[in-house]
Amino acid sequence: MYGNNDISQIGSAQGRGVGATTSDEPMALPQYKLVTNGSGKVWPVDENGGRLVIYTDNSSILVQQGFQRLRDRFKLLNKVRKILKGERTQHCFFNRVDRNDGVGVMFNKSRNKANYSNIMRCANAWGCPVCAAIISEHRKNEVKEAMDWWKAQGGSVLLLTLTVPHYSHTDIKQLKKDLKKAYSKFFKGVRASQNLFSKWMIEHYISCFEITHGENGFHPHYHILLFVPYAVGIGSHIGMEQDMYAVWKDCCTKSGLDEPSEKHGLHLQAGNDAANYVAKWGLEHEMTKGHVKKGKKESRTPFDILRSYQESGDETEAKLFRLYYFAFKGQRQLNWSKGLKKLSSKGQEEKTDQEIVDDTDNVAEMLFKLDIEIWHAIRQQGKQGELLVAVAEDQTLKKPIELIRQCLVENGQLRE
């Protein structure tokens, strides 16, 4: 294909600086090519072979905020592919859905985001840093919608954290099993829980499962939003917290776990404490981004472990990440009490993780399409994230073209 030194591409009018049409009919995408003379230079030409004028649009040179995080996620994904052999993450943002077609590069100008079409996405919230971020962002909006809906009716939302004792030698799979049993008893299984929810008028809840790692090994725990139909003032939740601890302690011991301490086993935030917490982090953020965000020095999230492996190459860290992944793979991260999702979202059904990552933006437009061999060069050089950033930074095509040229040179498909 490269014997004639041309690289077939497809580009949208908007991507080339051409004014958008006002017609309701979709505008046909004009053809253009990226051409090289073999010296390492690449430039776009129109369908007649004339040099394509690239119009500079200052509004399309976007702010850098968030771009570095995107780069970092794709770099981490490259490491995950090496650690989790045989898992779906190996195909994520790497292989194409239709093996006979290239990869489209899409851009949503209003959201300042670029994405790919015809690319596999693993939807693995536990092991893929790229898909986990996409899923978490969507779940965050769902949780915020529920909180806003409830507060608009005069209710309050409290944050409950449930933990159990654990040690560095604890069998993580058994701990997960016993913790899940205790959680089920607390919310569904014992008369004391039913009385507790009735006494304190807890009408709905959203729970999130999270895990960190520290000196005492893996630390799985739950964050739960409790929806009550009244205002919760300063100190007024203390009685509720005491009642909850008594029930939680009983649920743990009956599930084969050690008795949790009153200081560490259960924590309830309400009133000013909760308000300050929400102002700093956002409850919806805490509920959905637990293993994506960076933890404290003494308490690392799974992706902190992955970052450490990326920086040090220490196989002990890779082994630790694998242990975490295979212990919690398939665990549901977010659970809603019956009926809450439909009530807060006006009847909309909850999307699966796969539906979230596969949901392409309806208003995004294709800037250009990557030939199969070009995509192979980009993925071989691990530049999938870099290309999305280049497009988001500059839709005039200068940065994306230069990045593509570099990938082809480094892959031995062009001469420098």
Set out the residue ranges of the language-model regions.
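Right-hand nucleic-acid polymerase module
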Residues: 1-218, 228-416
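Cys/His-coordinated zinc-finger cores
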Residues: 224
